[in-house]
């Protein structure tokens, strides 16, 4: 009977470890086979930048430089995951700015990079530069307008 308890205890540990691993795998999202990209604004030679991994810091544009702060994995489940801050994804945020938050596969983290240049969320909002192409300008989301230059982006390797 002592052996049976040991086996049962080991089995329970394996089940718990397996369940935790499954949850972690589900939340992580799979990176696209194409590798990381930069999201370059059509306003100029400026790219989407995550200068801080803080949830309270806005995403901004800065001159494109190819650093990990400006590189993004477009995951198979349509999340835009930071290379500099793995496990942190672009979130629609609030009315003030877009920001990074833990990748949890919420609808507010589902994005499509469209051929017309829009980076559109499943909530029908698009990434928008809030002003001109000056370094440090905040990026937010607004109603999508395919004619708005501040909503035009290119996905570049």
From Swiss-Prot:
Gene3D superfamilies: 2.80.10.50. One of its GO terms (molecular function) is carbohydrate binding. The keyword Membrane applies. PROSITE patterns: RICIN_B_LECTIN. It is a single-pass membrane protein. Pfam families: Ricin_B_lectin. The keyword Nucleotide-binding does not apply. It is found in: Membrane. The chain crosses the membrane at residues 6-26. GO terms for cellular component: extracellular region; membrane. It comes from the Bacteria. Residues 33-157 form the Ricin B-type lectin domain. Keywords: Lectin, Membrane, Transmembrane, Transmembrane helix. Its main location: membrane. This is Uncharacterized protein Rv1419. It comes from Mycobacterium tuberculosis (strain ATCC 25618 / H37Rv).
């Amino acid at each position: 009977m002592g052996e049976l308890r040991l086996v049962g205890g080991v089995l329970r540990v394996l089940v718990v470890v397996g369940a935790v691993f499954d949850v972690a795998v589900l939340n992580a999202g799979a990176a696209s086979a194409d590798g990381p990209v930069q999201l370059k604004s059509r306003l100029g030679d400026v790219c989407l930048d995550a200068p801080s991994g803080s949830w309270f810091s806005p995403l901004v544009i800065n001159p494109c430089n190819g650093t990990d702060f400006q590189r993004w994995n477009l995951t198979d489940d349509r999340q835009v995951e930071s290379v500099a801050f793995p496990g942190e994804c672009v979130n629609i945020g609030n009315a003030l700015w877009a920001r990074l938050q833990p990748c949890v596969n919420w609808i507010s983290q589902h994005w499509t990079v469209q051929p017309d240049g829009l980076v559109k969320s499943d909530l029908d909002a698009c990434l928008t530069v809030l002003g001109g192409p000056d370094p440090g300008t905040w990026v937010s989301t607004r109603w999508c307008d395919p004619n708005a230059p501040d909503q035009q982006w290119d996905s570049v390797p």
